[in-house]
């Protein structure tokens, strides 16, 4: 699709002051931001944390993670999708496909191309098909609306229960259709209704069987036929007639034929029953509701519940406003609030699903979720603990009611610790919360024998615990040994934080000591770029001898390697709870700064061509904090320089506007923090100070609290901090604490300039796991 044509759809006609809560901030949201070039964002229609994400499914021969691709053929329009994920697709179920003319075989290839660029705006999606059909979409929390305009002639809608997003990567992660049923009824007022269910398994998280129920209506009279395929995957039809129902492990569905060129369908979903699916659509999209009214409902929900949480009167730069509000939008597409729709257990606790993934989101996304959505955040914490109660482990990732996978540590521990140290109490049972964390820290999860890594569990928990507990390091008998070790250390620091808060001194001492065990992977003899000492692998031989390692290479960087998806030099900066020790091991502050500077030097990496071959990778979460670590060495100006350069170079309000996979909003959350001028250290109350993008920002913290940030002398070439006042008091530290500006609200008043200034002469940021920190 032509990028400029796609982008222009969301450009606002004008820019007004954003100081009013009544301002339609949705005008600045580009649902298409990040939906191309590997960002994998979902450009369809959804509510914040909504179950339904109604959008197109396209086939290109490669994986369509959100259903959408900018090229290829439409194969359906489905109610369930993810956003910003990778690995393999999930969902793409409860689908309809409009077809003109006569449908002789509904299981044949019905795919069709675009006739023009899709139209997107918050709350609305439109596709123009090359066969003359126009598809317009709207959504509520548990239901969706399809509005079709057909050319003259017979008009059909095909409902294929077996429809699901496929995977083409050859890793055994493709979703499978396991069977389903469909029944067609005519209501008392003459409206056509269909309902049924489909069951599926596998997908990105290797899930067992799960079932979704559906209930759909059409606003026009229709003739119908149900169909039955020969098997679960083929195109051979063995039944295609006016039977009112089909139920089989083979492909089933129905074709509805209309005499009208305008047809509207309302479809609800549930994970409990078809009856509940009907109740959901009847409640949320009642008969007679118009698409434009539904669009306004969606816009209002996003405006009032999400976008208005950050406001500004600095409206001179539309690009910055689009980046701000598009990032807020995509950052909160998932997780999904499935409270009331959990088929596995009954509980008074909330239930959240579609957690992609804590190893990506714990650094910057979940801390931002806490600030902007405190009620949702508390519910989310309660849901994680409840999953542990009923399933034995908290998830590091979860979808379709099933934990899986875990790439590194048990990073739900970090999320819980972050909530605890920042005062989340409410209805959270913290004794159970700590017990869930203890399970991660002490119980070896059963090996799920993942062919990508058969050495230990990739489903949940910490599969390499035997080494970690016995040796204080992880040997190469376990895959991803080094990247696991640095994350396990952070996880144990999380336990220390909660244990300390619960006055469990024995546990606190134990896990603080264990959190320092990342040091056992610091190989003082590894050298690169004239620096010595990096995180390295250790063999399973007695004594854990060092294994030779190039600090600038992670080999395959995949499930079976010592480092997952990041270089040794990147992971060597990731002891964020113990940075003072890291600075010392690196040779002191000057050497530490020199190491950081090397990360941003073009041409030092054989990879990362899109980033100038730098070792720093803005599209990869282990690099997220790296630009801000200068604050620990007295060079806050370089934190501003490097983080601002990355943000402005690699983010844009366009389909290719992300530096990599969105990772369920992790990328967008990194940008949002940079725009605010802070960076969180998860599991601590510390926020590193950078430089804000707007002359003023007001962050609504809930409960009448707000953080107000101002920036005097801000310009495109004037963004270095000259001075800072916090709550009206001159400030000389390159960090603030939760209690300073978030717990009760506060103010941060920056004075900026075009050149660095030595303003941050006070205490360095805390390093709580360091003996001298």
Protein language model features and the residues they cover:
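Fungal secretory targeting signals
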Residues: 1-22
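Accessory carbohydrate-recognition regions in carbohydrate-active enzymes
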Residues: 18-366, 370-378, 382-414, 420-486, ...
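TPR repeat positional signature
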Residues: 491-492
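Short coil-to-beta strand junction motifs in C2/discoidin
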Residues: 691-694, 716-721
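Short aromatic-glycine motifs in intrinsically disordered, low-complexity regions
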Residues: 707-715
């Amino acid at each position: 699709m032509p990028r400029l044509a796609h982008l222009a759809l969301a450009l606002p006609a004008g820019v007004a002051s954003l100081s009013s809560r009544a301002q339609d901030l949705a005008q600045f949201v580009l649902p298409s931001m990040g939906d191309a070039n590997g960002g994998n964002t979902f450009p369809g229609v959804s509510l914040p944390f909504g179950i339904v994400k109604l959008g197109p499914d396209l086939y290109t021969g490669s994986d369509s993670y959100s259903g959408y691709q900018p090229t290829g053929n439409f194969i359906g329009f489905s109610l369930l999708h993810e956003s910003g994920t990778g690995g393999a697709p999930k969902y793409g179920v409860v689908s309809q496909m409009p077809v003109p003319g006569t449908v002789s075989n509904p299981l044949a290839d019905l795919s069709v191309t675009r006739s023009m660029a899709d139209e997107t705006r918050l709350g609305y999606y439109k596709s123009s098909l090359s066969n003359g059909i126009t598809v317009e979409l709207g959504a509520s929390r548990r239901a969706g609306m399809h509005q079709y305009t057909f050319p003259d002639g017979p008009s059909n809608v095909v409902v294929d229960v077996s429809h699901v997003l496929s995977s083409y990567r050859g890793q055994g992660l493709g979703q499978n259709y396991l069977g389903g049923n469909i029944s067609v009824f005519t209501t008392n007022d003459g409206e056509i209704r269909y309902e049924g269910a489909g069951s599926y398994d596998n997908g990105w998280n290797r899930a067992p069987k799960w079932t979704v129920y559906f209930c759909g209506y059409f606003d026009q009279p229709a003739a119908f036929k149900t169909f039955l395929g020969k098997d679960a995957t083929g195109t051979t039809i063995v039944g295609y007639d006016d039977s009112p129902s089909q139920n089989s492990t083979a492909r089933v569905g129905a074709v509805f034929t209309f005499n009208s060129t305008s047809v509207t369908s309302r479809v609800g979903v549930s994970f409990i029953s078809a009856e509940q699916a009907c109740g959901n659509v009847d409640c949320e999209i009642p008969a007679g509701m118009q698409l434009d009214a539904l669009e306004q409902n969606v816009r209002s929900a996003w405006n009032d519940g999400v976008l208005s949480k950050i406001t500004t009167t600095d409206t001179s730069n539309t690009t910055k406003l689009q980046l701000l509000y598009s990032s807020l939008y995509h950052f909160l597409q998932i997780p999904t609030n499935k409270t009331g729709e959990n088929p596995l257990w009954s509980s008074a606790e909330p239930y959240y699903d579609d957690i992609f993934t804590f190893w990506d989101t714990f650094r910057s996304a979940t801390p931002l979720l806490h600030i902007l959505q405190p009620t949702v955040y508390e519910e989310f914490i309660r849901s994680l603990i409840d999953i542990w109660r009923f399933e034995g482990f908290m998830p590091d990732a979860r979808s379709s009611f099933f934990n899986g996978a875990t790439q590194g540590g048990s990073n739900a521990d970090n999320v819980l610790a972050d909530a605890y140290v920042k005062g989340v109490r409410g209805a959270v049972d913290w004794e159970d919360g700590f017990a869930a964390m203890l399970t991660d820290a002490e119980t070896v999860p059963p090996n799920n024998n993942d062919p990508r890594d058969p050495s230990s569990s990739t489903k949940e928990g910490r599969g390499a615990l035997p080494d970690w507990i016995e040796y204080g390091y992880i040997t190469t008998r376990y895959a991803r040994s080094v990247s696991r070790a640095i994350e396990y250390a952070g996880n144990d620091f999380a336990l220390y934080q909660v244990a300390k808060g619960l006055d469990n001194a024995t546990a606190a001492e134990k896990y603080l000591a264990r959190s320092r065990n990342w040091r056992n992977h610091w190989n003082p003899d590894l050298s690169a770029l004239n620096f010595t000492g990096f995180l390295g692998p250790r063999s399973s031989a007695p004594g854990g001898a060092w294994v030779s390692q190039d600090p600038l290479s992670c080999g395959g960087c995949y499930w079976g390697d010592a480092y997952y998806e990041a270089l040794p030099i990147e992971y060597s900066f990731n002891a964020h709870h113990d940075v003072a020790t890291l600075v010392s091991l690196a040779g002191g502050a000057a050497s530490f700064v020199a190491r950081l500077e090397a990360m941003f030097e073009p041409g030092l990496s054989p990879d990362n061509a899109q980033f100038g071959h730098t070792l720093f990778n803005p599209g990869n979460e282990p690099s997220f904090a790296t630009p801000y670590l200068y604050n620990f060495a007295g060079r806050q100006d370089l934190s501003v320089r490097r983080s601002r350069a990355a943000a402005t170079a690699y983010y844009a309000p366009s389909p290719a506007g992300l530096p990599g996979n969105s990772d369920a909003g992790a990328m967008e959350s990194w940008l949002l923090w940079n725009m605010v001028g802070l960076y969180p250290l998860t599991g601590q109350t510390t926020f590193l100070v950078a430089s804000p993008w707007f002359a003023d920002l007001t962050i609504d913290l809930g409960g009448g609290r707000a953080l107000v940030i101002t920036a005097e002398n801000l310009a495109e070439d004037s963004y270095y901090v000259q001075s800072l006042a916090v709550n009206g008091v001159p400030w000389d530290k390159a960090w603030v604490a939760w209690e300073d500006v978030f717990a009760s609200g506060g103010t941060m008043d920056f004075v900026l300039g075009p050149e660095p200034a030595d303003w941050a002469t006070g205490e360095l940021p805390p390093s709580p796991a360091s003996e001298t920190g």
